[in-house]
A protein has these predicted regions:
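Glycine-/small-residue-enriched transmembrane alpha-helix faces in small-molecule transporters
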Residues: 1-39, 43, 149-177, 192-196, ...
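Cytoplasmic-side transmembrane-helix entry/capping segments in multi-pass membrane proteins
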Residues: 11-12, 67-75, 123-135, 157, ...
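Loop-to-transmembrane alpha-helix entry segments
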Residues: 104, 120-140, 151-158, 211-212
Length: 235
């Protein structure tokens, strides 16, 4: 299997898993808010991935990490596993699912745009068309065809979802500069999300245990939708 085919397969796996986000976000926030749901999901992701990394013997590499490595990992963890999901879960709880879904998936367009500046990639005709069509699709949905005005039910929440999508795009571009073992750095990303969501949960919400109905969405989200999907994504 060539590298390009393997990369395409990994992307397809991620897309299939991330398609479950609206489902787990809805059922996982029956009584929990976005801070609480993110905390429990991050806890599951961190526990599962760290156990896997430890059993494989790869976790020992963190001993050789420099301060710069830890700082960069913390930044990426905040961008891609905390801010992105914090705003995304808020969106699915308080805004129209279709609007959230469309704005959420602006990150592939933003990845192309950011790569031009941060990775010095060339702007080809294909990339130009992709960016233009992508933004046209987003504008069409948000304006409902009336391009003179934006018609969304909760503009602030949708704007936050858009900010989260930008953070995930930035995370995706910057993560290409990380040369560490994927399962190790991903487990550390979710450690950052776990700590950050714990602080924000206590600051803006409150500690709460998930209900019995919320356990399975949290497990599914923590193990697959968030957890292992990131290993495929950053490869």
């Amino acid at each position: 299997v060539t590298g390009r085919v393997r990369g395409t397969l990994f992307v397809l796996i991620c897309v299939a898993l991330w398609a479950l986000i609206p489902v787990v976000a809805r059922f996982g926030q029956a009584s929990l808010d976005n801070h609480q749901f993110l905390f429990w999901s991050s806890l599951v992701s961190f526990a599962v991935l760290t156990l896997n990394a430890a059993l494989s013997g790869k976790m020992r590499e963190i001993v050789g990490y420099t301060r710069a490595d830890w700082g960069f990992i913390a930044l990426l963890g905040l961008l891609g596993t905390y801010v992105y999901y914090l705003f995304l879960y808020l969106g699915y709880a308080r805004a129209s699912g279709l609007e959230v879904l469309v704005v959420q998936y602006t990150w592939p367009i933003l990845i192309v745009a950011l790569s031009l500046f941060l990775l010095r990639e060339k702007l080809t005709l294909r990339k130009t068309v992709a960016i233009a069509l992508g933004f046209l699709g987003v504008v069409t949905v948000l304006t409902k065809g009336d391009y003179a005005r934006i018609d969304v039910g909760n503009p602030l929440v949708i704007a936050l979802v858009g900010a989260g999508a930008f953070c995930f795009a930035l995370f995706s571009v910057l993560s290409k500069k990380v040369d560490k073992t994927p399962i190790v750095v991903v487990s550390l990303y979710f450690l950052v999300a776990l700590l950050a969501s714990f602080v924000s949960m206590l600051s803006f919400s409150g500690f709460a245990l998930p209900s019995r109905q919320e356990v399975w969405p949290i497990l599914l989200n923590g193990v697959l939708v968030n957890g292992y999907s990131y290993i495929f994504w950053i490869r």
